[in-house]
């Protein structure tokens, strides 16, 4: 039983979205894990809470002697864990109609190619009708 390998075929639906990088969002990400924003090159600086913090992060040659910059590689916090290897290169598709049924697309709000019903237009006739013309008998 030690050599028995199971192979699973999973179907996942990925819904991608765009998140605005507002200060509140960046502060939330920074509080979760400060290493997330370090490689994004956003220029996000944590707001100083007291006067020591205000001068601690200044990187100017006028305020301190320049030290040797260490370019040590950052350690991956998840390197000791083993996750699944999933290859999505051939199967990832944005064409949902081909893979999913209409009922499922309706449930998540994607309605397919049907157009909405036309709106009915009514005119409010508050004035009296114009009198009919008399016809001459020819």
UniProtKB/Swiss-Prot annotation:
Pfam family, one: Late_protein_L1
Keywords: Capsid protein, Host-virus interaction, Late protein, Viral attachment to host cell, Virion, Virus entry into host cell
Function: Forms an icosahedral capsid with a T=7 symmetry and about 55 nm diameter. The capsid is composed of 72 pentamers linked to each other by disulfide bonds and associated with L2 proteins. The capsid encapsulates the genomic DNA, but does not bind DNA. Essential for the initial attachment to the host cell.
Self-association and partners: Self-assembles into homopentamers. The capsid has an icosahedral symmetry and consists of 72 capsomers, with each capsomer being a pentamer of L1. Interacts with the minor capsid protein L2; this interaction is necessary for viral genome encapsidation.
Cross-referenced Gene3D superfamilies: Major capsid L1 (late) superfamily, Papillomavirus (2.60.175.20)
Subcellular location: Virion
Compositionally skewed regions (Basic residues) per UniProt: 129-138
Predominant location: virion
GO cellular component annotations of the record: viral capsid
Family per record: Belongs to the papillomaviridae L1 protein family.
Database matches in InterPro entries: Capsid_L1_Papillomavir, Capsid_L1_sf_Papillomavir, dsDNA_vir_gr_I_capsid
Region of interest: Disordered: 111-138
This protein's name: Major capsid protein L1
Disulfide bonds: none
Gene Ontology MF terms: structural molecule activity
Example GO biological process: virion attachment to host cell
